[in-house]
A protein has these predicted regions:
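N-terminal capping segment at the start of a domain
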Residues: 1-19, 184, 335
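His/Asp/Glu-rich mid-to-C-terminal helical/loop segments that flank catalytic regions of hydrolases
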Residues: 13-16, 195-209, 262-272, 277, ...
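Alpha-helical metal-binding/catalytic segments enriched in His/Glu/Asp
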Residues: 58, 78-121, 172-180, 185-209, ...
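Zn-dependent metallopeptidase/amidohydrolase metal-coordination segment
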Residues: 60, 288, 292-299, 306, ...
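Acidic/histidine-rich catalytic neighborhood of metal-dependent amide-processing enzymes
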Residues: 93-167, 213-217, 276-282, 286, ...
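A conserved active-site cap/scaffold subdomain adjacent to cofactor or substrate pockets
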Residues: 198, 222-279
């Protein structure tokens, strides 16, 4: 399956950050046509490719979360893993695309769906115009090679804004920088680790040292756990940093502080970021909320949050509770990009995949994931049997993202076996 790895390395040469996927769209469309597929592209940029009389559709998304120096992605191999130098790797979901490309070169009866802008609220699949010919859909966006996903979390974006003015003051100005945070990972898959949030740690540091905020921003993406944060703050007394917050004296002089200082700090410090409910039966997070980003610009304090739940009632509840929390502090709040969870069950496709997967991973099992999968939305648009698999990808959505090469080989074999059995 070396061609899968080569396919992936070639994909990494093409910029495909979310919202900036035009070059990748053109590449995949041309590739499919060259392999004899009939291709159509809808308004959202979703690419549908079909050849012969297929029974199964393979599906992956072609945008990536760009962190660090991405879209420049310099791939290298180290200790059996694919990594990227100073950037996210894009194995989520580039490896899935690479496997589909290999299958397109091999099979005469195949249907493929490449979806756009999955990483920004599953935008592409939510606007999907294509109707699939196949009755089974195999999604290749999972990140653990001993599991078959038949359920996933739904999600909703939440924004909270508060106007502020400034007050003139004079004194000592300190620059704060978050440091040593392991965050930046996927806010669904990695939220169970209970890693510290850079935004919350900085707010606590400022509050405990009686600081007055001049500026404060933190976080990277709505679906990444906050890793970075920085602030300019006035402290009356000399302040020293700690293991999480680097504190540097800048100067003494005049400045303007935020008149909503206490409300801003109280909002962050009182908010319960992270896991809210856990499913003991499936051993996965059931409901969570990610306090993702904070910005202060144009006299506006703006938070973005991402709520997830694997049950419909749980998602509606966390959305309601979060909005009421911010309203109580006087914020203007809105929610958008709501998509329901996929509360699936084992089916004929998952049974076929499990049989093939057990040959390479004897402990393979059927489960659900605390993250969004597009097949959950597609199966609500038309009647389909769905399942999701993928190779081991560690720390997606971060500069530490890495993908296990032998795991890619395993999943590639499984995909090819399932396709051959349904040729």
């Amino acid at each position: 399956m070396q061609n899968v790895i080569e396919n992936f390395k070639n994909l990494c040469k093409i910029p495909h950050c979310s919202y900036q996927t035009e070059q990748m769209k053109e590449f995949l469309s041309s590739y499919a046509k060259d392999k004899g597929f009939k291709v159509s592209i809808d308004k959202a940029g979703n690419i549908h490719a079909i050849k012969g009389n297929p029974k199964i559709c393979l599906q992956s998304h072609y945008d990536m979360v760009c962190m660090g120096e991405a879209p420049k992605v310099e791939v290298y191999e180290e200790n059996g893993f694919l990594r990227a130098k100073n950037s996210s790797l894009g194995a989520d979901n580039g490896i899935g695309i690479a496997i589909v490309m290999s299958a397109m070169a091999e099979f005469e009866n195949l249907e493929c769906l490449f979806t756009n802008d999955e990483e920004v609220g599953l935008m592409g699949v939510n606007s999907l115009e294509h109707t699939l010919s196949s009755k089974m859909l195999l999604n290749l966006d999972h990140e653990s090679d001993d599991e078959i996903m038949i359920g996933c979390a739904g999600g909703v974006d939440i924004e909270a804004e508060l106007s502020f003015s400034t007050l003139k003051a004079r004194g000592k100005i300190y620059e704060l920088q978050a440091q040593n945070f392991k965050g930046g990972g996927h806010s669904g898959i990695n939220i169970v680790r209970n890693e510290k949030s850079s935004i919350k740690e900085m707010a606590q540091f400022i509050k405990e040292n009686k600081g007055k905020i001049i500026s404060f921003e933190g976080g990277e993406r709505i679906n990444s756990i906050p890793k970075h944060a920085k602030a300019l703050v006035h402290f009356e007394n000399e302040v020293k940093g700690n293991g999480w917050i680097k504190c540097e004296f800048k100067k003494e002089g005049e400045f303007e502080i935020c008149d909503q200082n206490e409300k801003l700090l109280n909002t962050i410090n009182a908010f319960a970021h992270g896991v809210r409910a856990y499913d003991e039966h499936l051993s996965i997070v059931q409901t969570s909320i990610n306090l993702a980003t904070l910005k202060m610009e144009n006299q506006q304090i703006k938070f973005t949050l991402f709520a997830r739940s694997n049950i419909s009632d749980g998602l509606k509840q966390i959305e309601f509770e979060t909005m009421e929390f911010f309203k109580a502090f006087g914020y203007k709040v809105r929610s958008f990009n709501f998509y329901p969870p996929w509360e699936g069950k084992a089916n004929a496709l998952s049974d076929k995949v499990l049989k093939a997967l057990k040959k390479v991973s004897p402990k393979a099992r059927v489960s659900a994931i605390h993250a969004g999968l597009e097949c959950g939305i597609i199966e609500k648009k038309q009647e389909l049997l769905c399942a999701s698999i993928g190779p081991n990808i560690h720390n997606p959505h971060s500069t530490d993202e890495h993908c296990e090469i032998t795991s890619v080989e395993k999943i590639s074999r499984v995909v090819f076996e399932v396709l051959k059995d349904n040729a």
